[in-house]
Amino acid sequence: MSYYLVQSTDEDILKHAECGGAVTAFFKYLLDKKLVDGVLALKKGEDVYDGLPYLVNDSKELVETCGSLHCAPTMFGNMISKHLKDMNLAVSVKPCDAMAIVELEKRHQIDKDKLYTIGLNCGGTVPPQTAKKMIELFYDVDPEDVIKEEIDKGKFIIELKDGSEKSVKIDELEEEGYGRRTNCQRCELKVPRNSDLACGNWGTEKGWTFVEVGSEKGEELLKNAQKEGYINVKAPSEKALEIRGKIEKSMINLGKKFQKEQLDEKYPEPEKWDEYWSRCIKCYGCRDVCPICFCKECALGEDYLDKGTIPPDPIMFQGIRLSHMSFSCINCGQCEDVCPVEIPLAKIYHRAQLKIRETTGFVPGIDDSMPFLYK
């Protein structure tokens, strides 16, 4: 692996970026040189809790995508496979986005040769409504007064309209049931090395982006962007590498701790799951939002049910989904996010996947091989 500190040479990008603007600079280079048809990224909607997927065709609009949006837990994998698969794209990806793209490529739903994946180091995301309640309770401010947020050094930091900042330790927030989504708490993949380039601020100097190269395609992109004057590049110090490694290791260990707590020590008893399944209204939200569930025709779909009959029994519906998808679950948490009756679906899928991993060694989104059931 190769490591670099990267900084955009564009003053407008530097003005809007959080740490060097490398991600936006890579996107600008790709668009300007017509190496891609568009860039898929997030931009802020009405406020910091509203992250909108944005397809950019003009590099002048890229500054609208600068900065982090930790309260917008969206997924790009199924967006690409369902709506943009014929385009040459550059896309910003969290680790779970990158994992979804890997799994979809194996199933011929995405052609990765058409993609440049620019990874973003990720410590987790916060549901927008949870974020608003959390800010009201723990920061004692109106959530509408927040103009910017970031996660840094174990704290959730907000900036207000008057220019002031407030911060609270994430540990304290999560002890009270707030903070990051529970699937993010359990996540072990913090640096998306399964993307072409992995970018972040861990271990970096102020005003620079720490970039780890994940592929030959990524190395070529970085070198060409430097050659064309879009970025400044220098080598990170040994201390920077050490700091980054320590942060990543600490985050991974924390994820394993939450796995033990949520999927073992405090995992719901069978009776509780009976209660959860009885809530299911068969809305198909979990199926439709899952980035790995790609079947064009679903045996459980409404079109395949006799008219006048009730939809599948909840246990049958969820059981078939579990047997079909658990071996490839990437722990993105989307199924749990959209469930209108608050069934903790991500817990059972993630737990099942970890059991499969113990038995087979297969890690979805990381291994190049197909899941064992496909062999």
Swiss-Prot record:
Its EC number is 1.17.98.3. Binds 2 [4Fe-4S] clusters. Residues 268-291, 320-349 form the 4Fe-4S ferredoxin-type domain. Induction: Expression is induced by formate limitation. It catalyses: oxidized coenzyme F420-(gamma-L-Glu)(n) + formate + 2 H(+) = reduced coenzyme F420-(gamma-L-Glu)(n) + CO2. PROSITE patterns: 4FE4S_FER_1, 4FE4S_FER_2. Keywords: 4Fe-4S, Electron transport, FAD, Flavoprotein, Iron, Iron-sulfur, Metal-binding, Oxidoreductase, Repeat, Transport, Zinc. GO terms for molecular function: 4 iron, 4 sulfur cluster binding; formate dehydrogenase (coenzyme F420) activity; metal ion binding; oxidoreductase activity, acting on CH or CH2 groups, with an iron-sulfur protein as acceptor. [4Fe-4S] cluster 2 binds at residues 290, 329, 332, 335. SUPFAM superfamilies: alpha-helical ferredoxin. Transmembrane segments: none annotated. Gene3D superfamilies: Alpha-helical ferredoxin. Its cofactor is [4Fe-4S] cluster; FAD; Zn(2+). Dimer of an alpha (FdhA2) and a beta (FdhB2) subunit. Catalyzes the oxidation of formate to carbon dioxide, with coenzyme F420 as the electron acceptor. In vitro can also use methyl viologen as electron acceptor. The genome of M.maripaludis harbors two sets of genes encoding the F420-dependent formate dehydrogenase (Fdh), fdhA1-fdhB1 (Fdh1 isozyme) and fdhA2-fdhB2 (Fdh2 isozyme). The Fdh1 isozyme is the primary Fdh and the Fdh2 isozyme may not play a major role. Belongs to the FrhB family. This is F420-dependent formate dehydrogenase 2 subunit beta. The lineage of its organism: Archaea, Methanobacteriati, Methanobacteriota, Methanomada group, Methanococci.
